[in-house]
Amino acid sequence: VGVIVRSMNLRLDDLPHTGMTNYKDTPLEMRIPAAAISTNGAEKLSALLKQNPNLKLYYKQSCQTYDDVLSHNVIGEITGSEHPENIMVVGGHLDSWDLGDGSQDDGAGCVQSMAVLEMFKQLNYKPKNTIRVVLFMNEENGLKGGIQYAQVAKNNNENHIFALESDSGGFTPKGF
């Protein structure tokens, strides 16, 4: 028994868009294997199942889960000229999935965020509020960098008045 999931994208290709299965507190003996397959693979499997509804599929996985290791967010900022205690955050995340090099998910968001500070410096613009860039670690595996950032900000009584994380690649923004 297992589950096969069609890749969650609209392109027809042979690259599965990976994700993760989270069993939370499900006992080990109740967990079932799960795998994502490419859109082309899903189309082929669907056609085969239509031809033979009793088709049996055998697949073998060799994936592993490694223990977490210490990692860090990367933070840079321009201190506000009038209200340095008010913090505006823009950010992206540093980690990526196994099939990608991270250039879209989420290298583009990191570069976009760093460009905010670079442009302000080039224009010699002095923001009234603190502008902080946060490159979050471990977004893909449980948002751990963001959770840690929020906890530290809370412990330090920081006043965040704005936050924006770019995580849709270097394409036209779809919302704000």
Task: Report each predicted region and the residues it spans.
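BRCT (BRCA1 C-terminal) domain core and associated BRCT-interaction motifs
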Residues: I4-T21
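Charged, often glycine-rich, active-site loop that binds/positions anionic groups
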Residues: H17-Y23, L143-Q148
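Soluble metallo-hydrolase cores and metallopeptidase-like ectodomains found primarily
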Residues: T21-S103, A115-K128, Q151
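Short gly/pro/ser/thr-enriched loop/turn and capping motifs at secondary-structure boundaries
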Residues: L10-D13, S38, F171
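Short, well-ordered, mixed-charge alpha-helical segments that flank or form enzyme active sites
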Residues: R11-D14, D67, L143
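Acidic/histidine-rich catalytic neighborhood of metal-dependent amide-processing enzymes
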Residues: L70-N73, S96-F176
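Structural recognition of the beta-strand scaffold that forms the well-ordered cores
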Residues: G2-R6, A34-A36, I75-E77, I87-G91, ...
